[in-house]
């Protein structure tokens, strides 16, 4: 009888868990992802091999249900974020992934241009425009800018990359205005927006729109990407280092397993990303030796400083290295002695 009662309770619990797993909450759960070595995903024709490795970092994202919500509450480095922080209002999963993959494509192009220029190799590109890929809820661009809008100019000045335009807008402060000339459905219009502080980043002000650059890139030697189902712009730095390492001698890794994160622009400037603590945790779990983190020119709440804190909290032996540019990372690697075996 006791065994039957025990079995009944177990069955009830299993059914309850199954039912709860199908209840969608208005949240997403983010958690540490994986370290993915880039040598097998990026192939430069005639590229040089490496003794160590260069890896991009991912954060896993999934919809929350009551079960995963409670689970996330009990685990460090799991974060519960509102739907609107991940997806736009009315955006389907397919549309969200398309947007993420578009940002990855733009990031790959930036990495290629930065690396080939740094290595002194042939690279040329034509500019097709800057486009809006997402609009943040409760920010000035909401209702004024739509996904797919082409941004022609800001305050009368044209820009040749999303990064340069973002830098210009970021140079302003909360309360300042910016006038954008946009094209939507083959019609041009002007919108004036007043910058506002980001709710989760009070040190930063902006209009709340994500942008990407559309361009055609030609290089010599040829390069091939085999990165699938990984979206977003945060792998830019590590992709640029992998490409550069395949284009040049000697091997920059010197036998070390190197991870890192950060956006990249065509000039090799490194930008901040999200989920730095989760990426540090994932890199440590993967046994990486070195982790490059955006320094943001020494900002008080930079990704680098948060990465250092996380590494200390989890008692990691990884060396956390601050970088503002691709060249900073190369300079650091050039000074390293080869890893002893």
Curated annotation (Swiss-Prot):
The keyword Magnesium does not apply. Residues 187-336 form the Lon proteolytic domain. GO terms for molecular function: ATP binding; ATP-dependent peptidase activity; serine-type endopeptidase activity. The active site is at residues 234, 279. The chain crosses the membrane at residues 9-29. Keywords: Cell membrane, Hydrolase, Membrane, Protease, Serine protease, Transmembrane, Transmembrane helix. It comes from the Bacteria. The keyword Transmembrane helix applies. Residues 100-186 form the PDZ domain. GO terms for cellular component: plasma membrane. Belongs to the peptidase S16 family. This is Uncharacterized protein YlbL. It comes from Bacillus subtilis (strain 168). The gene is ylbL.
């Amino acid at each position: 009888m006791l065994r039957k009662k025990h079995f009944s309770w177990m069955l009830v619990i299993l059914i309850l868990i199954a039912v709860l797993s199908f209840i969608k909450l208005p949240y997403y759960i983010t958690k540490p992802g994986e370290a993915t070595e880039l040598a097998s995903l990026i192939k430069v024709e005639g590229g040089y091999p490496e003794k160590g490795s260069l890896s991009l970092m991912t954060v896993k994202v999934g919809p929350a249900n009551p079960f995963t919500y409670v689970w996330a509450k009990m685990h460090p480095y799991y974060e519960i974020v509102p739907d609107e922080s991940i997806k736009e209002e009315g955006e389907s999963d397919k549309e969200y992934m398309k947007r993420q993959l578009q940002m990855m494509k733009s990031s790959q192009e930036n990495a290629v241009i930065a690396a080939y220029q740094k290595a002194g190799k042939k690279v040329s590109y034509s500019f097709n425009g800057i486009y809006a890929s997402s609009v943040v809820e409760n920010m000035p661009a909401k209702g004024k800018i739509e996904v797919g809008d082409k941004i022609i100019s800001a305050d009368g000045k044209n820009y040749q990359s999303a990064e340069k335009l973002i830098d210009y807008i970021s140079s302003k402060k909360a309360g300042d205005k910016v006038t954008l000339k946009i094209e939507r459905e083959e019609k041009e219009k002007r919108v004036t927006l007043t910058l506002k502080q980001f709710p989760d980043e009070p040190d930063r002000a902006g209009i709340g729109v994500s942008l990407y650059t559309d361009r055609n890139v030609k290089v010599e030697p040829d390069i091939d990407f085999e990165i699938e189902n990984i979206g977003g712009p945060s792998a830019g730095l590590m992709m640029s280092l992998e490409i550069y390492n395949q284009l040049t001698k000697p091997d920059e890794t010197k036998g070390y397993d190197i991870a890192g994160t950060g956006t990249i622009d065509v000039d090799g400037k490194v930008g901040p990303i999200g989920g730095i603590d989760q990426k540090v945790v994932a890199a440590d779990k993967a046994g990486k030796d070195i982790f490059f983190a955006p320094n943001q020119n020494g900002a008080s709440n930079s990704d680098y400083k948060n990465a250092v804190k996380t590494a200390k909290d989890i008692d990691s032996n990884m060396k956390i290295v601050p970088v503002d540019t691709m060249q900073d990372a190369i300079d650091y690697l050039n000074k390293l002695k080869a890893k002893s075996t």
